[in-house]
């Protein structure tokens, strides 16, 4: 995957971007680790195949920071910079505060409808709306929703922000950096555009 220099015009606040078609991926993307990179890369390839923009929708702060007190792995500036280096056409950063947390799942669906997503790529554990009322199955009632499989490390463990955070807290920085995966590895660049599954399939 070709990296490009991140530029400010790529970034939008929630409810400010409207498109006539897109491929969308949504997530906290805390740390933009190797699993996130693979997911975003797959969404970008889907967009290129369809000839429409790719959009990465993320949150500041990551929801777990507000809901569970988890310390973010990166600042929003660093996160947006890393996502921008992967090369999507647009980045939407939603301010995850008490007001956003109170929004319903239907509110979220109405918002992302403005992006006219032809395909939405998400992780299997993605939830949205107040009290996590929305899930992939609900999203699939409105959009072509595809689940990206978890990325595992060589030891077989799933790469996750929580795992990286635990490694950092234990002082195991080399292991954490390996899971973070910067720079993006060639093996992740080759992830198939068909690597996910349709919700309900």
Q: For each predicted feature, which ranges?
A:
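Conserved beta-strand termini and adjacent loop/short-helix elements that scaffold enzyme active sites
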Residues: 6-8, 13-14, 57-59, 93-96, ...
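Active-site cores that bind ATP or allylic diphosphates and position pyrophosphate for catalysis
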Residues: 94-99, 106-201
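A generic structural signal for short coil/turn motifs at secondary-structure boundaries
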Residues: 32, 65-68, 129-130
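Positively charged, low-complexity intrinsically disordered leader regions
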Residues: 1-25
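Short beta-strand/turn micro-motifs composed of small residues
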Residues: 27, 58-60, 122
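Conserved acidic residues
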Residues: 21, 89, 118
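Short, glycine-rich nucleotide/cofactor-binding loops
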Residues: 23-37
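Core alpha/beta nucleotide-donor-binding catalytic domains of modification enzymes
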Residues: 38-111
């Amino acid at each position: 995957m070709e990296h490009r220099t991140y530029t400010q015009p790529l970034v939008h606040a929630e409810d400010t971007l409207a498109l006539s078609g897109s491929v969308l991926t949504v997530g906290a993307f805390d740390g933009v680790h190797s699993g996130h990179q693979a997911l975003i890369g797959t969404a970008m390839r889907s967009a290129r195949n369809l000839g429409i923009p790719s959009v990465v929708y993320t949150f500041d702060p990551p929801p777990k920071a507000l809901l569970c007190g988890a310390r973010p792995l990166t600042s929003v500036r660093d996160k947006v910079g890393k996502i921008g280096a992967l090369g999507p056409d647009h980045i939407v950063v939603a301010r995850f505060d008490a007001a956003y947390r109170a929004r319903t799942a239907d509110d979220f669906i109405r918002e992302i409808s403005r992006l006219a997503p032809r395909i939405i790529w998400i992780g299997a554990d993605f939830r949205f709306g107040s009290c996590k009322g929305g899930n992939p199955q609900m999203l699939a009632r409105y959009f072509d929703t595809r689940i990206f499989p978890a990325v595992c490390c060589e030891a077989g463990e799933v790469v996750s922000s929580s795992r990286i955070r635990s490694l950092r807290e234990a002082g195991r920085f080399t292991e954490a950096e390996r899971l973070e995966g910067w720079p993006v590895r060639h093996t992740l660049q080759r992830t198939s555009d068909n690597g996910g599954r349709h919700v309900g399939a």
